[in-house]
């Protein structure tokens, strides 16, 4: 694994906009950055793939343990939703995807930082944009037959939708916030993969989702019942909404399912360590401060907010601001990220269904990744 500095394509903005990637620049700063890329060999990709598959399986086992031992209160979930979440698990409601954030420099085992199991983003750039980047280089002769990419995301998403269609998911609603360009872009892409699988799709802004108490179902902006709904909107936010009580009686089936909120909550890090202590892919995690350098993470913090890195001297080496400062926290052993003269890198390893099938890499000058950290493509040397 190494970071390579190069030159962006002369017309890269037009290239990415042509394929629908409009949010390549955020607040006048580059988000998509092809002035550099990461290079791997196949052995390293196999390490990432195996780690991801093992971690996902352990997370599923951990969720089952939480349900069986009735530990949902550890996750800060209001008690009125506990039985409903258990029902979601027992009904084996399907999951589409998730993204593990891993710390790795190409040596030793990758270490799990967290699992973005509910509302993972950076999907379109991982699936389509970086693949288009690699193909365009190969078409110019710069890398003909020399490089590959860990990326079957597009194909696996279509296959996952085909499976859901076989289970009766003929029409699926998609919801996100119209005011968030990245979320809208990711949902638009997911709609396209569902359409390619033969599913009828309909988009609705999350604020326009209503509830029909007579039919006991959520409804769209045309008052049509929503049987299946993919929402790029966090479960923890939904449980705070005025309509949350209707979740308990609604016939609507959600994607991601309610049980997935257990895996996206950082409490799962401590549960994993309890179940699999000393596992090579895990970092020690606890509900109480631990010895040595550690990272303090609010259990529902998002986009790197309110994260604190604490050294052995118990002084904050780095901390970020945000709205989650008053939440319960998990303490996770600190593990260094890949570092180059350009900054720190986090590997985002994707799961579709229960299979690892792609990767995206975020880079930042700080050791805590946030929502505007740069996305760099990767390639595999054949």
Regions picked out by a protein language model, each given a short descriptive name:
Residues 1-382:
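Preference for protein termini
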